[in-house]
C-alpha cells in the first residue's frame, strides 16, 4: 500500500507568503522543528554562519517534527515553498523528488567530496536516481540510554550494558522509591522510538532489518518478536502517571534534575544536558543497550531545497548547502546538538565522552544499523507507530500485538 504525498498531505492555504527579494539580496527562510533549548542553540550555528556569509536567515521554527514536515511539504506542493526544509535522513522526501519539486545538490556534493567523507548508508539515504537531493548534516544515534550518575550510584548500580542489566536497575530504583525509574515521553513517535530501541537491543540486527527493511510478516509472528513485545510492555511499570503527552525534552530534564534515573532517547537529548551545563561521564552517562546482537541505530537530519525561480534564492540554497558541511560548522553544530559530525575528516577531539562513543559505533560497520526512516517509507512507519501506541496504551496482549504488526507489514507489501 502506498499513500502518495499529494493524498496524505493536506494542501493548506497559508499566510506565510515570502517577501520579494532583490537580485543582490541572499535571504533564506528555513523551516525546522528545533525548538528545545539545546536544539535552538544548535540551529543558531547555521543561522550565524549564513549571516556571516552575507545572508539573512528567516527562522520558521515549527514545534514538532510531523507538524514542521507537513507545513513545509504543504507549502512546497502549493507553490509557496521555503528556501530550505528540515527532514529526517531517509525516505521522507521521495515523493517530492518524484514530483520534480526539489533541486539536487549534486554539484555541491561533488565539490565537497561528500561521498569520500560520509558513511555509505548516509549517502544512499540522500541519493535518488543517481543524484543527491539532500544535505545530511549530522548522525544521530537513536537508541541511546541516558542516566543520572548520582541517581544510579544511590542504589549501587553501575552503567548497564544489556537490557537485562537495565531492567534490574529499574527494579532497584522502583523499590527505592525516591525517583521515577524511567523518564518517558508518552507521545506516539517516542513510544515508537522506545520500542525500536528494544527491538534492536533484544531482537537483534536481523529482526531490525527483517521487520523494517523486508517487512517480513512471518518474523512479526515469531517467538522472538513476542519476546521483544513483552520486554517493551514491561517498561511501562517504570514510568510515571504524568508520562502521557509529555515532551521528550521535559523527560530529559527529569533525568538532568535527578527526578528520574534513566531515559531512552536519541542523542539529541544530549543537547539538553549540554544546555544545562552538565558534563558527560561526570554528571550523566550514556550507553547503547544490547543483549548480544544489536547495533547502533543511525539516523539524523537533512535539509532539502525546493526548486526556485529566483536566482537569489538559488544562491542562498547553494550557500546553505556548502556552509552546513564545512568542518568548522560541523563541529560547532555537534557540540550544541548532541549529534556527531556526518563528515569523517573533521577534528573530533573537542567532542565529549558520549560523542566519542558514538564515533566509535559509527566507525564499526557491524554496528551501523540504518534508521527506520531509511528502511521503510513513511506510510509503513506511520502504520507501525499506530500499532505500537495502541499496544502501549491498552491491555492488548503480546500475541495480539504480534498479529497486528504482521497484518500491518502484510498490508504494506
Where do the PLM segments sit?
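Extracytoplasmic/periplasmic substrate-binding proteins
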Residues: 33, 92, 193, 230-313
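Extracytoplasmic/periplasmic substrate-recognition and gating elements
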Residues: 24, 48, 52-53, 78, ...
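Glycine-centered hinge/linker elements that transmit conformational signals in sensory
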Residues: 170-172, 213-244
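Hinge/lid segment of periplasmic solute-binding proteins
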Residues: 88-142, 167, 194, 281, ...
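Conserved N-terminal structural module of periplasmic/extracytoplasmic solute-binding proteins
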Residues: 21-99, 111-112, 159, 244, ...
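A structural signal for short loop-to-beta-strand junctions that line the ligand-binding cleft
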Residues: 74-75, 82-83, 114-147, 180-181, ...
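Extracytoplasmic/periplasmic solute-binding protein
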Residues: 132-137, 167-217, 260
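C-terminal capping/gating helix-and-loop segments adjacent to ligand/active sites or protein-protein/ligand interfaces
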Residues: 339-344, 356-413
